[in-house]
Amino acid sequence: MPERCNSPVLNFSIFRPYLTKRKTKNCMSELINDFNNYRSKMNEVILAKDNLVLKRFWSLDNQAYADGALNSKTKELLGLISSMVLRCDDCIKYHLGKCHELGTTTEEMYEVFAIANLVGGSIVIPHTRRAAEYWEELLK
């Protein structure tokens, strides 16, 4: 079992909607590692089935977020807003990670959160809380 530090974090999972206290690693939280590992593992399982429609859809998704008239950072921010309004926690985590990789600032991120709440209404607030938690973990 990997070494853990004493820093607690709430774990929000689509498969475990209740809250649990967990300990995190210093470099990257278990919350982030769990999400990335699960996503990678399941992508491999799905792509190994060699379904042409799924492969084409995922290719289209990758192409859509490439630089074009809009740069990829702007597209990821738009994807994050859409994911928050649609209340897809896994999608939110994915776009938060990409936004972090692309140099999004915390100030920019909270403007995105504000727009998502304006568009989606109060039902987006719980997703904003989880997004803020995940963002804070990315910044560590």
Question: Where do the PLM segments sit?
Answer:
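Alpha-helical scaffold segments that form or flank carboxylate-/histidine-based iron centers
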Residues: 74-83, 112-119
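Polybasic, low-complexity binding patches
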Residues: 106-110, 139
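Acidic, glycine/proline-rich low-complexity segments that act as flexible tails and inter-domain linkers
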Residues: 2-76, 127-140
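Short, thiol/selenol-centered motifs that function as redox-active sites or metal-ligating centers
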Residues: 78, 82-94
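Iron-sulfur (Fe-S) cluster-binding segments and ferredoxin-like electron-carrier domains
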Residues: 95-106
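Residues in soluble alpha-helical coiled-coils and helical-bundle/repeat scaffolds
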Residues: 65, 69, 86-87, 104
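Residue-level detector of well-ordered alpha-helical segments, enriched
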Residues: 73-77, 91, 108
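C-terminal structural segments of small proteins and small subunits
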Residues: 110-133
